[in-house]
Amino acid sequence: MRLIPLKNDEQVAKWSAQHIVDRINAFNPTEDHPFVLGLPTGGTPLKTYRELIKLYQAGKVSFKHVVTFNMDEYVGLPKEHPQSYHSFMYNNFFNHVDIPEKNINILDGNTPDHDAECRRYEEKIKSYGKINLFMGGVGVDGHIAFNEPASSLSSRTRIKTLTPDTLIANSRFFNNDVSQVPKYALTIGVATLLDAEEVMLLITGHQKALALQACVEGAVNHLWTVSALQLHRHSIVVCDEPATQELKVKTVKYFTELEAYAIHSVI
């Protein structure tokens, strides 16, 4: 595992966006051989999307031959609802770059057969061979996508019941009314994430400090979904200083020295 400890969330956004661009350009994608990118929603990746848009506008990258798969979507929320993850992705990213509509993949939370939709999604991913890079965020309790604490580390795309903590956390997007937050979501599984060639998690803010500690210093534990990243052969955690508050000083020092070149690339 690589840990990139940066000063603030602005640096996290710049570093992660540049890393995605570098990976896409090094891959040299074509229509017949596209780069496959996994994407999250939520507050943490917003600044990364803004940086990606800037890099696209500056001519540093094209998304014409990039295929995307999003992590999750609420069940029962219309696609056009302002808080659906469809709306989030189009408003904050897809509408601002040159990605073809046919290359965008987001789970359909309104399908009558959720199990069939989840199987279709897994099969679609496999049709491309693998996801080349999956970017993700992490919840306060260490969940990735909607893989809540105690999710199976061998899980695949499926329907999940959201925990009370997640409902409360997400109520800020629904006028702080928990009753308006969908109770279920379709989500990729932990094993789906770990199948990706590379996984990059963004962890920012002091409220995520325990999750970062579980990810880097803790044992692999299904109660901390994020700890499964330790099992991945090519994983990167990009974090800011507030998120490192629960890490041992020597841990931060070790990775700061180890990743000195990567860190200075955004300073």
From Swiss-Prot:
Site (Part of the allosteric site): S151, R158, K160, T161, Y254
GO biological process: carbohydrate metabolic process; glucosamine catabolic process; N-acetylglucosamine catabolic process; N-acetylneuraminate catabolic process
Regulation: Allosterically activated by N-acetylglucosamine 6-phosphate (GlcNAc6P).
Alphabetically ordered keywords of this record: Allosteric enzyme, Carbohydrate metabolism, Hydrolase
EC top class named in words: hydrolase
GO molecular function, one term: identical protein binding
Keyword Hydrolase: yes
Hydrolase in keyword set: yes
CDD domains given in the database record: GlcN6P_deaminase (cd01399)
Pfam name, any one: Glucosamine_iso
Gene3D superfamilies assigned: 3.40.50.1360
Active site as annotated: D72 (proton acceptor), D141 (for ring-opening step), H143 (proton acceptor), E148 (for ring-opening step)
SUPFAM superfamilies: NagB/RpiA/CoA transferase-like
EC id: 3.5.99.6
Catalytic activity: alpha-D-glucosamine 6-phosphate + H2O = beta-D-fructose 6-phosphate + NH4(+)
Pathway: Amino-sugar metabolism; N-acetylneuraminate degradation; D-fructose 6-phosphate from N-acetylneuraminate: step 5/5
Chain ranges passing through the membrane: none
GO terms for cellular component: cytoplasm
Function: Catalyzes the reversible isomerization-deamination of glucosamine 6-phosphate (GlcN6P) to form fructose 6-phosphate (Fru6P) and ammonium ion.
Family assignment from sequence similarity: Belongs to the glucosamine/galactosamine-6-phosphate isomerase family. NagB subfamily.
Assembly mode: Homohexamer.
This protein's name: Glucosamine-6-phosphate deaminase
